[in-house]
Amino acid sequence: MKTKNLMTLLLAAIVALQFNNGLIAQEMNKMWGEQSAGNTEVKRGRFFDWGNYAMFIHWGLYSQLANKWDGATYYGNSEWIMNKNMAGIPLDEYKAVAKSFNPDKFDAKQFAQLAKDAGMKYIIITSKHHDGFAMYHSQCNKFNIVDATPFKRDPMKELSEACKELGLGFGFYYSHNQDWTYPGGTSGPKVDHEGNPKTFDDYFVEKCLPQVEEITKNYGEIELIWFDTPGRMPKQYAKQLVEVVHRNQPRALVSGRVGFGLGDYRTFGDMEVPLENVEGLWEGVDVTNDSWGFAWYDQNWKTPKQILGYLIATIARGGTYMLNVGPDPSGQIPEMAQISLRTAGEWIARYPQVIYSAESSPWKHALPWGDVVVNDGKIYLAVFDWSSYGKLYLPGLKSEITSVKLLTGNKSQKLNFTREGNLTIINTPCPKPEKLVSVIEVSIKGDIEVDNTLFVDPELGLKISTKFSTPENCNVKYKGWLEKYGEWKHIYQIGDWNDKSSTTWNFEIMTPGRYFVELTATGTGNRVWNVMTDEGFEIQNRQNTSSIYHTQPIGWVNFKTAGKHSLTVRIPEGERANTSLAEIKLTPFE
């Protein structure tokens, strides 16, 4: 769990009483001032640990192109369109795009208000991405939005002021290693315009370091600086940048992507939510659609329920969630992104205790119907799959329960419950009370004690990663890949199969009987899957696989008794070597 102090608990109380009024920001600033006045060690990240939710904005010269160049559309992250892996735009031609970049519909107050309406607590925006173009008025390099474009305004100054007015934190993304247009920057030209050789040290001294000084001195108080892609840059440069940030902004965090373990917190891979709890300060970063910067074709927007799903899952694993939007060439955030964000924000306004100052789940992983967070000693069940039979099964809670309540905004309804062995069975009303995510508050006596054994829900079954299995003569490994350029997918999978390999899941079932088994896998050719229970019930099925993960039916197994059981998967025949097994799913017979 994240470490919470007295200040955080006080903030939680303020949120509960004053969520929809501007006193939150005032109280936070007051308490931070009091804390730092009496403490020589300044606490960093005012909003990061408490707020749990932030807006990321990828906006730059690439937004003008919107993934089109020379009549062709390039699919992937728009901020990479200049790169050789996409359009491979020559440096001078890319820089010339600045002459037509005029996002005249940009309104900083609208950006900040959207973040506030969405329930986000701070904004991080690209001050300079890999293309080297500065989205603020840089004094050390003319390739910036004020000096090189007809826009002639500093949107970062306007946005920092709008955030301050609305009580939001503000900070910058800065690409410290890659600079594709400045001589000496990684992946940039090796010589200047006069043909003189340039090194990374030249780039660092002439542009990178001065610009980090600018963004940490000229825009008021900063929540954090989000560096990116350190690559093979020497550690000494990253160390110097961290020192600059901490000197100029004592309360600001430095992201883990500065490299070399020098950051104040850990940043996971793009679009990645861990499957198990992670200790310490960390964040997950994600997109509202597929591309970070604006792409004309990209309409694959996350729904409000999907946004809440990723947000709550990140908090339940112990992290902070930062969700990206990409303004269009006119400087406006796409309408569908706004709709999803505001709708999710309306839900957050009804259930702030599920988000702000919330801590990780004692179960340490998701449950079949949703996820769990803890706030001020109370357990909050975020139920995504509401029971159609009027029962919610909460496994493994050992603590004495004093009350169970269904929350509906500012109202609550007492729910009856029973305890059966390792299960708490909560009687729930039909239909589901919330369109998006329903919330049940469980109050307990004393400390929270949990047996986090996997549980096969009598109604929903269980879908679980191989990360939670025990392999023998094979290995569970993390796997990440690009679905298309810039769009990451993440799984854990079992590979390195041979004729002696197996993997076993341990879990608990409440209802004896038959369960349908499905496996999610990839590979080439055919293989035979063998599935056996701890009671000796065995099924076997031959299936073909493909280069993409898909779910395959295997058959029915039978568990004769309730309680703790295990299920083991083997490949007795067929193409083993290139097989990747990602998940197993058990569905109860109805």
Model segments located where?
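Bacterial Sec-dependent N-terminal signal peptides
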Residues: 1-27
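Mature catalytic domains of secreted/periplasmic carbohydrate-active enzymes
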Residues: 26-511, 518-521, 525-559, 564-590
